[in-house]
């Protein structure tokens, strides 16, 4: 456990050597070693010392080094059988002896090192080789103890390089697992010594040494993922103290007591002026009284006493190394290495070097650090504490490296570093990037780059928001980051810089990350609801931090609480009482305040003014004292020394300088501290006295006005016998004294706002907080909290992006801005944030060329050539097409762009059409939509012909160039190219889709679009016409929900009609637009027929001049409407409008033909006659019959239409009779049909007086036909009397009058014909109705009326003569009538000869007409016979014959 646990023979870094070297064969190994022996001997022979001894050929004089090499040469070829079983020490040791010898020079030592390096890299021995561990150990030990004579600096550096080479090969070798923890520490120590010594050598050696060190760290920590945790890993001993940090308040840098980089120089340094120095890397023991510490000893001292260090390397050596790297940072601080101290090169100073090594370790170890508590603790405390300090360095290089480390820590260990990360963001990154604390531009840029790198991580902002902004104990890091980025993106009094672009990139990365997480389907509702009731907010916990179903509603709830807490804190800072009352009102504090709830409010709320809080806690009021004690109980002081606990306690508020308040505060603190840590102190009084003494010591040590400082002895003496009469341990008090002396207990006046500087007290609070904070929430790829975050960041992002977009010149920056704005548009639509989308549209529209004071020429050129204008235009219409559902007020700006494009004549011709749904769109129209091959621009065909105007643009100049009266220059090729490009841009924008696809818009957005079209139409007539066309197109495209917008559309069109006095294009479009809407929608919306047709009444409201101008076209459109939709119109209301329009055309010369065609289509053969439109059609037909516009045939046809309609009445009557069984209903329908018939009779009667003979006579004939058609109709009996009274009798009277008046003007023949027809009409009508009316009481009156009119006709003279035809016809008709009456029993002889009986009355009138008729109808014989048969005096008169 705790050591490397690889699969057999595997190592993560061995692949490098496998690629470069192949393992030698058994024979080759011996040959290779033999070669290396020869090489070493050859170099030795070149040396005078070794050469003389060799020449002497005296075995006794041969040196042991040479002898051992020769002996090895004798043996190697005998080992060829299996090198795996040969102890490596046998063939390694002779080379190591050369390395260890202090008699060899640098060249010899270098060759020996090369030989060892070759043996290691060629894998002569592996883990399976016997005694491999001992072999690896002696190699490391020998190289560490390398001795040689220095002859020249170059050879010395070569040896140092080869030392590094061999040590690195040891770690990279397959046999590296044979190294112990001690060996690894030795290797690292040795390399560090070379690194330091290289500072006085060449730059090449410096680079190689540092590179080797990085490689070592990478190799070592790359094994961390394969190492299992130790059972007792937390108990691993590290020589240096862990987590004990002293602070220098003056420099702001940490001090360290466990190392000094200068000691390395003292230990490893050689006299450069003395070339005879024998050792470059001497091993020297340092005495303690020299107060110098060698780096190697730091690691080795801890290793010597532990058996774990002798085991195969694993966690123990990694803990030592990582702790040492953290220590190196402390050493750097003590050595005061900063941007102003540059011993070699600034980028290679100790802190930067240490940070680079740490970064390498974290990169390779990655998430595996969390499996090892000791390493994790080093990161959480030591490392982060140093990072907080070096983050405030003036060096951009150091800050950059620190930020890289933090990024790696975030990516790999963020779940274990929640509070530390929050502190780094707040105290370092945000503070530096804010540029208000003396940071240089380079520092700000580095900090900004780090923030942007973090924002580019997919889950960063979501996790920051969930873990910090939604935690009441943490600051709002997400809001701070977004605000900072948005502010830094704004150029202030200067040009756009890289910083602005960088900040903008961070903002855009945030919104693009959100946009990538959202799905295609829109959420139903993502707005959380919270129950408003009192709850102890500090006790709210999540059941499962790993399940979004639990933590998402939890963090939203906490965020809701936090918002109210922040408001409460703000009010508390201004007025504590009002603040507490507010918190009670929002249910965060109970209705009756209790000390615990107020104390928890103080403890867990961010943003409180520490001064106000300190005054409250120090107040002598009893409730405040209770709150103070409850506040102290919220701290956990277990296992803390008193000084640390006091720092933590008083760091949460401002301790007042008033003695009584200090006393109360320290009393509460002491009571709590003693309760939890009663180990050394005997009672709480001792804790109180010591705490008070610490406060006094703090003032004494760090107050500038105190000249004589308290010494350690003074402090110890002052605290004698305070522990129940006994003294506290001297070591305990000494530790407290030095802690306070080196690091002040800072009680600054924190106002609760802004980014503060990290202090010792704050760091202690961070460590304390990290132990009790809630678990870190890891977010996945889902957009759980994106709505909440987007609502915060959208406004600032739009504003910042717009400013950068306005000032940027590079196209890639412009594209980046557009990408960000489109991401915002996507999110706004996804979360239904219409106001955000509207703001975005407004911002983008400002960058189009349509809102600038440009001429038409300039606008087209800008659109065609300027990238900013082009991108903005494309983005506006992309948003309108893709996210139009969620645009409200933004439609106004979009339509202004469309109107501007229309004025520039670069819109597609079909922009305002609904061609996709129009079945009658002609081929020619479709051809117009195709782009012309001619590059010369042509004015849109959709422009109204009645509105000729001269364009000021070069398009207009081109068209007008053909006019001989005007001479204007033709547009240049550049202008034409710009126009062509602009037209292509507009085409790619698919502006027509906005209106054609409006049928997919949500109701609210559609209504906003319609309203915007109406509002945009008031600027000029051309714009009004274009907007009206668009409005009509939108209406037609939304036929399935026409009621949603129709009232608004109709009101607008009605206003146009009523306010227009003369013909113009606008009113023309309005009228025919309504007709088109009705034509297109009636087939699909039968339930809206009445509503649509009612709208046509606006045509009736046209001014006379306007109506006259368009009457013919109106009639033609009505014909189309009727022919296409007659079967869909069922109600009287709908037909009333149609018939009214047709009736108007009857007297219009051009329109009457089309109007009558429509009427004939409706009435012919009763095709579309209905009870609901019957009377209306009769009236219209009457208008056409009476109208003298057109030929006589049209009037006759109109009369025929009326008379033929009687068959429809007969059919309806028969259908009613067959389908209705209820008598009442049948009677009602009969009455309605009767009324229609009577209406028919009356309307025909009116035409019977027409001045035109053909029309008049034909009308009488058709009236007779209509009356005759009543046989098939169930007419109520009283209706016949109405027919005679209101039609027949009046007709005869009027005809007679008409004939008399016109007898002088017309031929007697035509007058007689009319009288004859009228007489026949009355006679036939009477006979037809006789059966139905003879039994009615009014029959006698009607009969007398008939006789009177016959008598009048007989006696009337025309031009002094009676009409022969009339006088011949009437007796015949009367005779026929009397015979019918006789046959039917209506007229019978009466025996009341002297009375006024029906019989007598009849003959009284008949005899005046023709005296002979009585004898012809009733011969005397029949009369006598009738009287004899019925002579009974008592019989009453025949019924019905009374007058």
UniProtKB/Swiss-Prot annotation:
Residues 1425-1435 have a biased composition (Basic and acidic residues). It comes from the Eukaryota. Residues 939-949 have a biased composition (Polar residues). Disulfide bonds: none annotated. One of its GO terms (molecular function) is guanyl-nucleotide exchange factor activity. SUPFAM superfamilies: Sec7 domain (SSF48425). One of its GO terms (biological process) is endocytosis. Disruption phenotype: Slightly abnormal Golgi stacks with laterally expanded cisternae. Abnormal formation of spherical bodies in the endoplasmic reticulum. Its main location: cytoplasm. It is a peripheral membrane protein. Pfam families: Sec7 (PF01369), Sec7-like_HUS (PF12783), TPR_28 (PF23325). Residues 917-949, 1424-1443 are annotated as: Disordered. Keywords: Cytoplasm, Endocytosis, ER-Golgi transport, Golgi apparatus, Guanine-nucleotide releasing factor, Membrane, Protein transport, Transport. Gene3D superfamilies: 1.10.220.20, Arf Nucleotide-binding Site Opener,domain 2 (1.10.1000.11). GO terms for cellular component: cytosol; Golgi apparatus; Golgi membrane. Signal peptide: none annotated. Residues 554-743 form the SEC7 domain. It is found in: Cytoplasm, Cytosol; Golgi apparatus membrane. Homodimer. Activates the ARF proteins by exchanging bound GDP for free GTP. Plays a role in vesicular protein sorting. Acts as the major regulator of retrograde Golgi to endoplasmic reticulum trafficking but is also involved in the endocytosis process. Could function redundantly with GNOM. Regulates vesicle trafficking required for the coordinated polar localization of auxin efflux carriers which in turn determines the direction of auxin flow. Mediates the endocytosis of PIN2 from plasma membrane to endosomal compartments. Required for maintenance of endoplasmic reticulum morphology. This is ARF guanine-nucleotide exchange factor GNL1.
């Amino acid at each position: 456990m705790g050591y490397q646990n690889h699969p057999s023979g595997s190592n993560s870094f061995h692949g490098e050597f496998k690629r470069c070297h192949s393992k030698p064969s058994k024979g080759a190994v011996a040959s290779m070693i033999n070669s290396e022996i020869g090489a070493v001997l050859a170099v030795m022979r070149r040396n005078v010392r070794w050469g003389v001894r060799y020449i002497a050929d005296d075995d006794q004089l041969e040196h042991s080094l040479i002898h051992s090499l020769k002996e090895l040469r004798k043996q190697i070829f005998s080992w060829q059988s299996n090198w795996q079983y040969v102890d490596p020490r046998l063939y390694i040791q002779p080379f190591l002896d050369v390395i260890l010898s202090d008699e060899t020079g640098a060249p010899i030592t270098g060759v020996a090192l090369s030989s060892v390096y070759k043996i290691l890299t060629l894998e002569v021995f592996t883990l399976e080789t016997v005694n491999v561990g001992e072999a690896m150990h002696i190699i490391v030990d020998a190289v560490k103890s390398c001795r040689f004579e220095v002859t020249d600096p170059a050879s010395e550096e070569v040896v140092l390089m080869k030392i590094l080479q061999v040590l690195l090969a040891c770690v990279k070798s397959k046999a590296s697992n044979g190294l112990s923890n001690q060996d690894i520490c030795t290797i690292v120590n040795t390399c560090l010594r070379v690194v330091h010594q290289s500072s006085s050598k060449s730059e090449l050696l410096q680079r190689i040494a540092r590179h080797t060190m990085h490689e070592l760290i990478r190799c070592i920590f790359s094994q961390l993922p394969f190492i299992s945790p130790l059972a007792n890993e937390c108990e691993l001993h590290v020589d240096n103290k862990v987590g004990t940090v002293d602070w220098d308040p003056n420099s702001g840098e940490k001090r360290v007591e466990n190392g000094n980089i200068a000691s390395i120089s003292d230990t490893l340094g050689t006299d450069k002026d003395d070339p005879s120095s024998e050792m470059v890397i001497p091993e020297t023991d340092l005495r303690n009284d020299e107060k110098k510490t060698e780096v190697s000893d730091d690691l080795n001292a801890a290793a010597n006493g532990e058996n774990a260090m002798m085991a195969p390397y694993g966690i123990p050596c990694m803990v030592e190394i990582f702790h040492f790297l953290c220590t190196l940072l402390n050493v750097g601080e003590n050595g005061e290495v900063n941007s102003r101290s540059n011993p070699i090169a600034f980028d290679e100073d100790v802190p930067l070097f240490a940070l680079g090594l740490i970064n390498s370790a974290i990169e390779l170890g990655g998430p595996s650090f969390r499996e090892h508590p000791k390493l994790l603790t080093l990161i959480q405390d030591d490392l982060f504490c140093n990072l907080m300090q070096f983050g405030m360095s003036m060096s951009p290089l150091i800050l950059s490296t620190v930020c890289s480390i933090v990024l790696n820590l975030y990516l790999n260990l963020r779940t274990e570093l929640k509070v530390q990360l929050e502190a780094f963001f707040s105290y370092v990154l945000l503070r530096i990037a804010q540029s208000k604390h003396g940071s240089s531009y380079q520092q700000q840029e580095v900090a900004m780059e780090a923030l942007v790198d973090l924002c580019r991580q997919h889950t960063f902002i979501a996790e920051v928001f969930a873990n910090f902004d939604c935690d009441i104990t943490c600051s709002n890091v997400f809001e701070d980051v977004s605000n900072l980025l948005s502010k830094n993106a704004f150029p202030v009094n200067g040009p756009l810089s890289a910083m602005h672009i960088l900040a903008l990139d961070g903002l855009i990365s945030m919104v693009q990350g959100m946009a990538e997480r959202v799905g295609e389907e829109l959420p139903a509702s993502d707005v959380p609801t919270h129950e408003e009731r009192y709850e102890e907010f500090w006790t709210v916990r999540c059941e499962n931090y790993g399940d979004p179903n639990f933590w998402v509603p939890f963090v939203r709830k906490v965020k809701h609480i936090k918002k109210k807490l922040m408001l409460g804190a703000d009010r508390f800072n201004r007025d504590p009482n009002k603040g507490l009352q507010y918190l009670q009102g929002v249910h965060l504090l109970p209705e009756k305040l209790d000390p615990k709830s107020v104390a928890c409010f103080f403890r867990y709320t961010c943003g409180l003014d520490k001064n106000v809080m300190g005054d409250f806690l120090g107040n002598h009021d009893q409730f405040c004292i209770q709150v103070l004690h409850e506040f102290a109980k919220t701290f956990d002081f277990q296992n803390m020394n008193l000084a640390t606990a006091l720092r933590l306690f008083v760091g949460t508020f401002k301790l007042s300088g008033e003695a009584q308040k200090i006393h109360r505060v320290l009393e509460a603190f002491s009571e709590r501290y003693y309760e939890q840590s009663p180990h050394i102190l005997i009672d709480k009084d001792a804790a109180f006295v010591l705490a008070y003494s610490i406060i006094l010591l703090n003032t004494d040590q760090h107050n500038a006005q105190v000249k004589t400082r308290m010494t350690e002895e003074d402090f110890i003496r002052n605290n004698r016998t305070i522990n129940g009469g006994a003294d506290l341990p001297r070591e305990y008090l000494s530790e407290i004294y030095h802690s306070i002396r080196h690091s002040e207990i800072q009680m600054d006046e924190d106002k609760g706002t802004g980014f503060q500087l990290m202090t010792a007290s704050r760091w202690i609070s961070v460590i304390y907080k990290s132990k009790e904070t809630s678990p870190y929430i890891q977010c996945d790829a889902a957009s759980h909290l994106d709505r909440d975050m987007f609502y915060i960041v959208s406004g600032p992002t739009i504003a910042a992006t717009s400013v950068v977009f306005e000032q940027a010149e590079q196209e890639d920056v412009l594209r980046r801005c557009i990408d960000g704005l489109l991401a915002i548009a996507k999110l706004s639509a996804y979360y239904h944030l219409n106001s955000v989308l509207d703001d975005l549209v407004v911002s983008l529209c400002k960058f189009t060329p349509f809102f600038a004071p440009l001429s038409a020429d300039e606008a087209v050129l800008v659109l065609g050539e300027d990238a900013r204008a082009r991108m903005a235009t494309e983005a506006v219409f992309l948003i309108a097409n893709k996210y139009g559902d969620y645009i409200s007020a933004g439609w106004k700006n979009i339509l202004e762009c469309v109107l501007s494009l229309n004025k520039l004549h670069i819109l597609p011709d079909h922009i305002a059409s609904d061609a996709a749904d129009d079945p009658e769109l002609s081929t020619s129209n479709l051809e117009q939509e195709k782009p012309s091959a001619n590059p010369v621009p042509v004015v849109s065909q959709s422009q109204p012909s009645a509105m000729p105007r001269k364009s000021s643009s070069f398009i207009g100049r081109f068209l007008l160039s053909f006019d001989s009266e005007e001479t204007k220059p033709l547009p240049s090729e550049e202008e034409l190219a710009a126009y062509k490009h602009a037209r292509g841009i507009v085409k790619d924008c698919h502006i027509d889709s906005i209106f054609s696809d409006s049928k997919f818009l949500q109701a609210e957005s559609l209504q906003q679009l319609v309203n915007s079209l109406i509002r945009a139409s008031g600027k000029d007539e051309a714009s009004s016409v274009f907007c009206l066309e668009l409005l009509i197109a939108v209406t037609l495209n939304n036929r399935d929900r026409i009621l949603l917008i129709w009232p608004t559309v109709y009101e607008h069109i009605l206003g146009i009609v009523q306010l227009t006095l003369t013909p113009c294009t606008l009113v023309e479009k309005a009228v025919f637009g309504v007709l088109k809407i009705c034509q297109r929608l009636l087939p699909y919306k039968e339930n809206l027929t009445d509503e649509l047709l009612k709208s046509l009444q606006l045509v009736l409201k046209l001014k006379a001049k306007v109506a006259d101008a368009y009457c013919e076209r109106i009639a033609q459109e009505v014909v189309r409407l009727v022919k296409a939709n007659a079967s869909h119109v069922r109600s009287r209301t709908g037909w009333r409008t149609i018939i009214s329009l047709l009736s108007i055309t009857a007297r219009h010369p051009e329109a009457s033909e089309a109007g009558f065609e429509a009427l004939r289509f409706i009435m012919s053969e009763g095709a579309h006659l209905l009870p609901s439109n019957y009377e209306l059609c009769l009236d219209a037909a009457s208008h056409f019959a009476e109208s003298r516009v057109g030929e006589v045939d049209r009037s006759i046809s109109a009369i025929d239409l009326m008379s033929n309609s009687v068959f429809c009445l007969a059919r309806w009557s028969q259908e009613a009779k067959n389908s209705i069984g209820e008598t009442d209903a049948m009677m009602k329908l009969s009455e309605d049909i009767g009324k229609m018939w009577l209406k028919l009779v009356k309307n025909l009667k009116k035409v019977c007086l027409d001045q035109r003979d053909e029309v008049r006579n034909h009308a009488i004939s058709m009236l007779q036909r209509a009356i005759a058609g009543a046989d098939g109709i169930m007419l109520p009996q009283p209706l016949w009397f109405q027919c005679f009274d209101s039609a027949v009798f009046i007709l005869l009277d009027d005809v007679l009058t008409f004939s008399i008046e016109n007898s002088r003007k017309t031929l007697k023949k035509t007058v007689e014909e009319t009288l004859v027809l009228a007489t026949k009409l009355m006679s036939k009508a009477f006979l037809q109705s006789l059966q139905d009316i003879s039994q009615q009481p009014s029959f006698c009156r009607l009969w007398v009326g008939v006789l009177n009119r016959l008598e009048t006709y007989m006696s009337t003279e025309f031009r002094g003569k009676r009409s022969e035809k009339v006088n011949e016809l009437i007796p015949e008709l009367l005779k026929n009538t009397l015979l019918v009456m006789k046959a039917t029993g209506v007229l019978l002889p009466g025996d009341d000869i002297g009375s006024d009986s029906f019989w007598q009355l009849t003959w009284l009138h008949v005899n005046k007409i023709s005296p002979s008729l009585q004898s012809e109808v009733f011969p005397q014989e029949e009369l006598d016979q009738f009287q004899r048969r019925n002579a009974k005096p008592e019989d009453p008169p025949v019924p019905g014959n009374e007058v």
